[in-house]
C-alpha cells in the first residue's frame, strides 16, 4: 500500500500537460454536511464568492473522511474553529462539508467571500497523489465556472495569511503556476465544449 501511494504521487513540476482531459464539469461529490455549530459550520451566509482558496491538511496520510469527522467533532471538543467547504482525499474522492453559500472557517478574513478546499496528502512533503491532483483541478475549475471566476481568482492559504499552506505549492512556485494553468485549461475546455 505504501509503495502504491508513493508511486502515485504527482510530480507537480513535471506534469503540466498531463491533465489535458480534465474539464470543469461537476465532479462526483459525497455530500456530508457538518452539523450547524459555532466551531465548524456557523451557518453564516457568504457575502458572495470572489475566489477559491486551496489548503492542505498538514496531517500526512489522513483521509478525507477523517478530516471531515474531525471538523464535525469540533462542536464537542471546542478546541478551535476550523472547517472547509470541500475536502479532496488521497484517492481523489471529494467530500462536501459546508455548502458553497455558507462560511467555512478556513481562510481568516477571506472566509466570507471564498470557497475553501482542504487537500489530503500522503507524506510530509505535502505533494498530492495523481488522483488527488486530478480531482482538485476538476473541482477548482468547476467552482470557477459556477461562480464566474478564472484561475487568477484561485489562491493559496499562504496568499491570505503567509502560512505555509498548501506546503508543496508554497515551496514549489512552479508547481503552483502549473496547477493554475491546469485549472485554466479545464475552464476553457468546458467553455469551448458548451459553445459547440
What are these regions (language model features)?
Residues 1-3:
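Sec-dependent N-terminal signal peptides
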Residues 7-107:
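N-terminal catalytic cores of peptidoglycan-degrading enzymes
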Residues 83-88, 115-121, 144:
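Catalytic nucleophile-His microenvironment captured as a short glycine-rich beta-strand/loop
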Residues 78, 85, 89, 122, ...:
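Active-site-proximal helix/loop segments of hydrolytic enzymes
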Residues 12-29, 123-196:
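Basic/polar, cationic surfaces and motifs that engage anionic cell-wall
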Residues 57-58, 110, 115-124:
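Cell-envelope and extracellular/periplasmic
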Residues 44-46, 78-79, 105-109, 124-135, ...:
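Extracytoplasmic/periplasmic, Sec-exported soluble proteins
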Residues 54, 115, 154-156:
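Hydrophobic faces of well-ordered beta-strands that scaffold small-molecule active sites
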Amino acid at each position: 500500500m505504501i509503495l502504491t501511494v508513493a508511486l502515485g504521487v504527482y510530480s507537480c513540476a513535471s506534469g503540466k500537460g498531463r491533465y489535458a482531459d480534465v474539464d470543469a464539469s461537476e465532479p462526483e461529490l459525497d455530500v456530508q454536511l457538518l452539523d450547524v455549530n459555532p466551531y465548524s459550520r456557523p451557518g453564516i451566509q457568504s457575502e458572495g464568492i470572489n475566489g477559491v482558496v486551496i489548503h492542505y491538511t498538514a496531517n500526512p496520510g489522513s483521509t478525507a473522511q477523517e478530516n471531515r469527522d474531525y471538523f464535525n467533532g469540533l462542536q464537542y471538543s471546542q478546541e478551535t474553529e476550523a472547517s472547509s467547504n470541500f475536502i479532496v482525499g488521497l484517492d481523489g474522492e471529494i467530500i462536501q462539508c459546508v455548502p458553497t453559500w455558507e462560511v467555512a472557517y478556513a481562510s481568516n478574513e477571506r472566509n466570507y467571500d471564498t470557497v475553501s478546499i482542504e487537500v489530503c496528502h500522503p507524506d510530509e512533503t505535502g505533494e498530492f497523489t495523481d488522483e488527488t491532483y486530478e480531482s482538485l483541478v476538476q473541482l477548482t475549475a468547476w467552482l470557477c465556472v459556477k461562480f464566474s471566476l478564472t484561475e487568477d481568482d484561485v489562491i493559496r492559504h499562504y496568499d491570505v495569511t503567509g502560512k505555509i499552506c498548501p506546503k508543496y505549492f508554497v515551496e514549489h512556485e512552479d508547481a503552483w503556476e502549473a496547477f493554475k494553468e491546469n485549472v485554466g485549461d479545464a475552464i476553457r475546455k468546458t467553455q469551448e465544449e458548451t459553445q459547440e
